Structure formats: structure tokens, C-alpha cells
Curated annotation (Swiss-Prot):
InterPro entries (alphabetical): QueC, Rossmann-like_a/b/a_fold
Pathway note: Purine metabolism; 7-cyano-7-deazaguanine biosynthesis
Residues that hold Zn(2+) according to the record: C192, C201, C204, C207
Positions with a binding annotation for ATP: F13, S14, G15, G16, Q17, D18, S19, T20, T21, C22, L23
Segments passing through the bilayer: none
Protein task: Catalyzes the ATP-dependent conversion of 7-carboxy-7-deazaguanine (CDG) to 7-cyano-7-deazaguanine (preQ(0)).
Gene name linked to the record: queC
Protein name: 7-cyano-7-deazaguanine synthase
Cofactors named for this entry: Zn(2+)
Cofactor stoichiometry and binding remark: Binds 1 zinc ion per subunit.
Any Gene Ontology biological process: queuosine biosynthetic process
GO MF: ATP binding; ligase activity, forming carbon-nitrogen bonds; zinc ion binding
Entry EC no(s): 6.3.4.20
Record family assignment: Belongs to the QueC family.
Length: 239
């Protein structure tokens, strides 16, 4: 399915840097942009109110907040248990302790059902394999497998679009700047695992990744923007 044949999309929207950047881009490309936000009792659940505020500010077609508290009961993680401190070290299985097992499986499944009911042709998600937090459900192969499962399971053409898949964090900042929304993304989104809007706590892994990307972009704007254009043109990982 080509982007030209898509007019209505559902954006998996957390209110963070990545999903907000995807939402901003989608508003320039599609006739109807519907956001869906998931409340799973997350540690940083302030992001839900941030998502509501941004949805209104950006005037998207509709915004739905869905209760998926069952995920909190099933998945033990630093993002679902306040008693588990967020760690910079990997667990024995090689994953960060902020990994929520099954989260993107559930989110994309529910977004797919919602897209089916709306008659949307695509789901947009801000997952990224190039410069990510080590989550297996952010990988390209996973997304393609989920897309195939949704298409086969619902007998409907449905594309999962991943605008950030092969971008690093600096390029993601450049993408927001390309649409004249760098300040909005910097100051009004919530990426911090401790629930602090904007630049965040500065200590958690999410804040470190976000800050490093921003500093790289601000120090090398022309170079990063050029690399963004190349990555966007090829749609493939950059070597």
C-alpha cells in the first residue's frame, strides 16, 4: 500500500517525543489523523494528560484513551511497578528493566482493531531500531510480523507505518524541526520515565537518550538534516 492511497490513519500516541513527531508529520500527509493513547498504569502516567493536551493543541481528528490496566497486572517492569527503580544496567536476559513484555504487541493489536472500526488504512507508530532502548518490540522484523498478523487476522489491508524506524535521536529532532515544531516537542512532550515534561529529570535512560540526540542535532544541524533527508529518501538503515 502506498502512502498516496492512505487518507485515514491511527497514530499510537503516548505524548512523548517520538509519537508526537510522528503525529506532527502525519497531520501534513493524511486527511484524517486519529490518536490512540493507552493507560496501563504506567509509572509515568502523566504522559496521558500530556497526550490529551497535545491532541487538542494540534487539532487532530479524534483522540481516544484506552484502559489496558490488565497489562500492568501481567507485565512486571520498572514502568509498571513503582517499587522497582529504573536502572541503567541491563537485566540477566540482556534487556533493560523498563521493558514491558507484550506492550507493543497489545498496543498494535488494539490500534489495528480501532483502525478497522474507523476504516483507517494505516497505523503509525514511533518505534525505532536505529537508536532505541533495547526493546525487542521496537524492531523492524517485529513490526512487519505484526502487520502480517493483523492483515491475515482481520482480512483487511492495513499498513503499519514507522517513520522513525531507521532514524537516530538527532534525526528525530531534525524531523520535528523540519515541520517547525522543535520547540513544541522539546518543551511540551513527556519522554521521562519519572513523569517530568520537557527536558525531564535528566537522569533516567529515556532522558539521557533524548538529551544526547538533542545536543547532537543542535551542534550539527546542517549535517543531521542532510542525513535525515537521505534516510527519508532511502527508507533504509544508514551505514
Amino acid at each position: 500500500m502506498s502512502a498516496a492511497s492512505v487518507s485515514k490513519v491511527v497514530v499510537v500516541f503516548s505524548g512523548g517525543q517520538d509519537s508526537t513527531t510522528c503525529l506532527i508529520q502525519a497531520l501534513t500527509q493524511f486527511d484524517e489523523v486519529h490518536g490512540i493513547t493507552f493507560d496501563y498504569g504506567q509509572r509515568h502516567r502523566e504522559e496521558i494528560e500530556v497526550a490529551k493536551s497535545l491532541a487538542k493543541r494540534l487539532k487532530i481528528t479524534s483522540h481516544k484513551v484506552m484502559d489496558v490496566s490488565l497489562l500492568n497486572e501481567l507485565a512486571i517492569s520498572a514502568l509498571t511497578r513503582d517499587a522497582i527503580p529504573v536502572s541503567h544496567e541491563l537485566m540477566e536476559n540482556g534487556l533493560p528493566n523498563t521493558f514491558v513484555p507484550g506492550r507493543n504487541i497489545l498496543f498494535l493489536t488494539l490500534a489495528g482493531i480501532y483502525a478497522y472500526q474507523l476504516g483507517a488504512e494505516a497505523i503509525i507508530t514511533g518505534v525505532c531500531e536505529t537508536d532505541f532502548s533495547g526493546y525487542p518490540d521496537c524492531r523492524h522484523d517485529f513490526v512487519r510480523a505484526m502487520e502480517s498478523a493483523l492483515v491475515q487476522g482481520m482480512d483487511k489491508k492495513l499498513e503499519i507505518i514507522t517513520p522513525l524506524m531507521w532514524l537516530n535521536k538527532a534525526q528525530t529532532w531534525a524531523l520535528a524541526d523540519k515541520y517547525q515544531q522543535l520547540d513544541l516537542v522539546r518543551h511540551h512532550t513527556l519522554t521521562c520515565y519519572n513523569g517530568i515534561v520537557g527536558d525531564g529529570c535528566g537522569e533516567c535512560p529515556a532522558c539521557h537518550l533524548r538529551k544526547r540526540g538533542l545536543e547532537d542535532y543542535l551542534q550539527n544541524k546542517a549535517e543531521v538534516m542532510a542525513s535525515l533527508d537521505k534516510a527519508t529518501e532511502t527508507g533504509k538503515p544508514q551505514t
